[in-house]
């Protein structure tokens, strides 16, 4: 009898050791009774289905017995690639039972994610476009290849997009709404602004790319981490069915406290071939404290000012991969016209747009895009911040060609119809054809210079082996780099 009792205790100990655990979220703002559950690698579809049925059964029993949580249970399911999991509202007894299941890797309290942008002054010229095709600040022309991101889809994981804004020329579409507020519009303005920087005909970098609105933040610019993960999952599934994940970009101008689940979801999308640009954050602190910016496989973007100095608000540190214009950036606003905003939220869409541009031009995808942007960029940013390992400012390659404008430029696109009369800008004379410098490739044909400085009125105003990645050296080096020699 004693032998059998010993075996039973031993098996129970093994089961407990193999079960999941509930992660602590530190100082992040948690959402009461809301949790994200991530299943272990190797969980089959059948096991996952049985687990969900079991969860619903015990949850119904517990809430009926205790009379809790009217709007409860599983709300989001994640099933793309290696990442299996779900999120929902559960009482304490249910979430303890879930975390004790050996099939569960971990349970994470749901937290609030917010935008990384803030409204600034109105009617200032947007300098970001010109800067990313020039050797030095102060130029006024944006020179780019006429392919302009054609064939690439950019997913705006944000507050939504005004898809009817004329600057999108019919290339914007509504994808999904994870907020479930019944308001399939951008009631904040943040998402429309970032989308304009990515693909708008006037303020955009990839002027022929498409943009899909994926609403994960409410009209106040905040939303649950579980909804962000659901948004990434939706993007990956949609891209795989519409042109391929290797022709897709996700921009995430948002962030919150460190989240293992959110970082895993972002890494899974990159592993499938998508390019993810993520805002570093606006707290003037180490970006490793924020998700999804702390995920090693995404392209984390800090903000620069017009004088090429790191913007005072921009996060810094080893997690930052690149810098891009982020102070006083003018772009589209809901309802028409434009507005100026500042933040790493404005820097990230510059990288997303340029990523789409390079993907169309060179046929690369996934993490290779961020590496390519590092090669094309210029070492221009001053005061990049403590522990930051780069001072690279993004560039579309024009500066690598000696700052010379390619020959035979085509006409720039016409700006959006302003709400007040404006004087038209003078057309730019094309430069003479130039021979490439020794060792440099010939310039790409049919570039287009643009005058991005026309002011517009304003009416006021983050798997090769998915699980291995999480436990691998690179992930921990990035997350806890301050402790490494």
Curated annotation (Swiss-Prot):
Q: Where is the composition biased (Low complexity)?
A: 419-428
Region annotation Disordered: residue ranges?
377-462
Q: What does this protein do?
A: Secreted subtilisin-like serine protease with keratinolytic activity that contributes to pathogenicity.
A molecular function (GO) held by this record is: serine-type endopeptidase activity
Q: What is its EC number?
A: 3.4.21.-
Which residue intervals are annotated with compositional bias (Pro residues) in the record? 409-418, 433-455
Q: What is this protein called?
A: Subtilisin-like protease 1
* Record domain Peptidase S8: where: 126-400
Q: Which residues form the active site?
A: 158, 190, 345
Q: Which domain of life is it from?
A: Eukaryota
**What range does the record give for the signal peptide?**
1-19
GO cellular component terms? Answer: extracellular region
Q: Which Pfam families match?
A: Inhibitor_I9 (PF05922), Peptidase_S8 (PF00082)
Keywords (alphabetical) are:
Glycoprotein, Hydrolase, Protease, Secreted, Serine protease, Signal, Virulence, Zymogen
- What positions belong to the pro-peptide in this record? 20-116
Please state every residue range assigned to the domain named Inhibitor I9.
34-116
Where is this protein found?
Secreted
Q: Which GO terms describe its biological process?
A: proteolysis
What segments bear the compositional bias annotation Polar residues?
A: 377-394
The similarity annotation says:
Belongs to the peptidase S8 family.
Q: What is the species of this protein?
A: Arthroderma otae (strain ATCC MYA-4605 / CBS 113480) (Microsporum canis)
